[in-house]
Curated annotation (Swiss-Prot):
This is Gas vesicle ATPase GvpN. It is an enzyme of class 3 (hydrolase). Pfam families: AAA_5 (PF07728). It catalyses: ATP + H2O = ADP + phosphate + H(+). Residues 22-43 are annotated as: Disordered. SUPFAM superfamilies: P-loop containing nucleoside triphosphate hydrolases (SSF52540). GO terms for cellular component: cytoplasm; gas vesicle. The lineage of its organism: Bacteria, Pseudomonadati, Pseudomonadota, Alphaproteobacteria, Hyphomicrobiales. Its EC number is 3.6.4.-. It is found in: Gas vesicle; Cytoplasm. One of its GO terms (biological process) is gas vesicle organization. An ATPase that functions in gas vesicle formation. A minor component of the gas vesicle, also found in soluble extracts. Gas vesicles (GV) are hollow, gas filled proteinaceous nanostructures. During planktonic growth they allow positioning of the organism at a favorable depth for light or nutrient acquisition.
Length: 357
């Protein structure tokens, strides 16, 4: 695949992520509704053929009325892609982040406070008529607002919420009806707006704080698997986000991709690691080469922690894996004077080890 630089209208992101404006909360018929986000273009996003393909496939399901689900490991850009696709729909966006403490009331709404009314009638001077009423105040939450107004709902990492929380979604996607709890009083259900769309993301490889998705919900979702971006996309993103020369960014990208391909880690190094190294190197003016001890230290700080999750690893195994990482640095970020000439065991290795504590 070939990559392209950011176009005149680069990828769209949402106001809640550093750009755009938010529509403030409002009261509607005694209800309080949460604010929605307005999509707007953002510079620094590179749209490659891979992104365009995923966007086209996702919009195909959404335009047909199906909820979309982007599934993939950490660092594959699921959330960014979901926000980009949502922006293409041209509707306000409401975002929910999955959480174990999230309940149905957090999606639909609940009674929040009371509205008091007191009338004192003294039309007849020696007779006082007193009338007092107290009504509970209903507050719409994100799902209800999106269904009522026809907004786009982005539910990020939805498997972090308990499965029973999502029972209310089954009727939304199948019957296009949102059933409200009895406390709502005014209405027991609402008809889902025809423009309502939903986009989910999840990480199937995560195991900490994640619940299995219920079959009834998974069966209603159109799932697209998102893999790690190809080299062309990583290179284009790194160059656009950091302003680094493409040749220097390519060295960092190739280093991290080789480290990921080695499998010699406990936490997978993703494109975030490449961007971390490239951004710091660009800001600090480092030479992307094994000749610069500060750059070598930067790579060590960003990548070595992924080899071991704690201090229990045996010293021998630790040193072996560190040596393998340093060999990759020598290979993919070689000396500028003699590119790729110094291999493991040579003078560059001594320079690498001398740069590290």
């Amino acid at each position: 695949m070939t990559s392209e630089a950011a176009s005149k209208d680069p990828i769209s992101v949402l106001s809640g992520f550093g750009a755009g404006t938010a529509t403030s909360a409002s009261k509607n018929g005694g209800r309080t509704t949460p604010s929605a986000l307005t999509p707007r273009p953002r510079s620094g996003f590179v749209e490659t053929e891979q992104v365009r393909d995923l966007t086209r496939r996702g919009l195909g399901f959404l335009n047909a009325g199906y909820p979309l689900h982007f599934r993939g490991p950490a660092g594959t850009g699921k959330t960014t892609l979901a926000l980009h696709v949502a922006a293409q729909l041209g509707r306000p966006v409401i975002i929910i982040t999955g959480d174990n403490e999230l309940g149905t009331a957090d999606l639909v709404g609940s009674q929040r406070g009371y509205h008091y009314r007191k009338v004192v009638d003294q039309f007849i001077h020696n007779v006082t008529k007193l009338e007092e009423t107290a009504n509970q105040h209903w507050t719409d939450h994100r799902l209800t607002t999106a269904c009522r107004e026809g907004f786009t709902l982005v539910y990020d990492e939805f498997t972090r919420s308990r499965p029973e929380t999502h029972n209310v979604l089954l009727g939304v996607f199948e019957e296009r009806m949102l059933f409200l709890p009895a406390q709502a009083r005014e209405e027991c259900y609402i008809k889902v707006h025809p423009e309502f769309r939903a986009i989910f993301t999840s990480n199937p490889q995560e195991y900490a704080g994640v619940h299995a998705s219920q079959d009834a919900l998974a069966d209603r979702l159109a799932t697209i698997d998102v893999d790690y971006p190809d080299r062309a996309m990583e290179l284009a993103v790194a160059s656009a986000r950091t302003g680094m020369a493409e040749a220097s960014a390519a060295r960092i990208i190739d280093l991290v991709r080789a480290f990921r391909a080695s499998g010699d880690y406990q936490q997978t190094p993703t494109m975030r690691a490449s961007l971390m190294i490239a951004r710091v190197a660009a800001l600090e003016g480092l030479d992307v080469s094994v000749d610069d001890p500060r750059f070598v230290q930067l790579c060590s700080d960003a990548l070595e922690s992924r080899i071991f999750s704690g201090q229990r690893a045996e010293a021998v195994a630790r040193e072996q894996r560190r040596a393998a990482l340093y060999a990759l640095i020598e290979t993919y970020c070689p000396s500028v004077a003699k590119p790729r000439a110094r291999r493991a065991g040579g003078g560059a290795r001594a320079g690498v080890e001398g740069a590290l504590p």
